[in-house]
């Protein structure tokens, strides 16, 4: 009998097919650890030939037993999987981590880290532009693109090797191969040489991450129509670039390639850039990017995106047609659950492929799903946070339901967006009294010293409580941790006097916004 069907009839699940917050955590009925063979008592395994990732991290393929038994098998070596594996190993559990591609996941190899190294190289260009506007400096900065790409690859390789070594030192068994769940406690791994091995575990953690999504008519052909991974590895800076989608990936890529000399056009179907943020943030971002030479088209959907005569051609639903040397499709992510066998392990997949989990991130009595694969929050630090929770849950150190707290998020570049907590739009949707307050960065000495004081800090109050803090401007990502602490501690009003801000700092803009007059918003 299907576990989810049975428990849904018993009232354990919401009737909503895509409900990702199940009513009763699986840990109440999870399999006793004593029902499985002891990992420490299993037959000694012999080490087979070492295999090698493309980033040169050694992963050991094991032989000598038809069924290798572990306390926990982790599928996916990204931030969430690696974090969980490390904590579990330190807690005395035997852990196997199976990775099909690169240790470190998308974040290290083709996401967060390489994009920040790109943006770090062009950051001085933005500073110089601001100082030139103030007529206190002039000049030019040339970035060696080839040298930058080599530096990025060295950094990724070194970081992946360090991660692999640290996990091995903790006692984690690293296995390179494609993992498929064949049962609630069984995983079949197909190694790179075509051989296979079966792993048996008390618990399985699904941490396979996600990949770039595409819509019909806009599927990357990896020639002129590219995804974000293609863009990070592009051989040369394109003369022109169309970016479809103005979320974090699209905005960061647009910023970098514009700074490198590409003529960039951003196309976003929503009414403003950064569509998950409030309109004032997205609209101001569009104005400021326009001043840097980036063309922003919003409120228009893309009809098709194809390669023609070696160029990318984008047809818009309003009849316009755009052509560029390259086009980036940055319209979201899709989970890596196809071929994972999650259903064989007793898990249920939602319509978009995400794994349904309960309040303790359990997808079945023996399986957890963390990070992008459960669809709750597609951020590397959220995956890591979930991985740490799940590890503590397995170790018996954490018994309460998972609580993320306010999740910080940032968009990086010469202009940045930071947010912790909810937007005013989200507050309005939940009802009650909503107020906002703002402080312009123009009044901050450190923002002025950096040459670009455009932007603001915004506070959202919901029924009198501090509910959200966001910011737009140069360097505002550095405010995110202080903003999170302010939100968690509810530092406002008289309580704000207990929180001392150093002077002069960009953080003082947070203080100014918290003390600014509030405005009631109704729409």
Spans of features found by a protein language model:
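Beta1/beta-strand and adjacent pyrophosphate-binding region of the FAD-binding site
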Residues: 67-78, 239-244
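Short hydrophobic core segments
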Residues: 73-75, 179, 199-209, 244, ...
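Glycine-rich dinucleotide-binding loop and its adjacent helix/turn
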Residues: 112, 208-263, 267, 295-296, ...
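Low-acidity, Ser/Thr- and Arg-rich intrinsically disordered low-complexity segments
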Residues: 8, 14, 21, 29-42, ...
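A conserved FAD-binding loop/helix module that cradles the flavin
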Residues: 284, 370-426, 503, 507-523
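Flexible, glycine-rich terminal cap/loop adjacent to redox cofactors
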Residues: 75-80, 84-101, 106, 113, ...
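FAD-site-proximal beta/loop scaffold in flavoenzymes
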Residues: 221-238, 321-396, 482
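Glycine-rich flavin
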Residues: 68-70, 87-93, 98-237, 265, ...
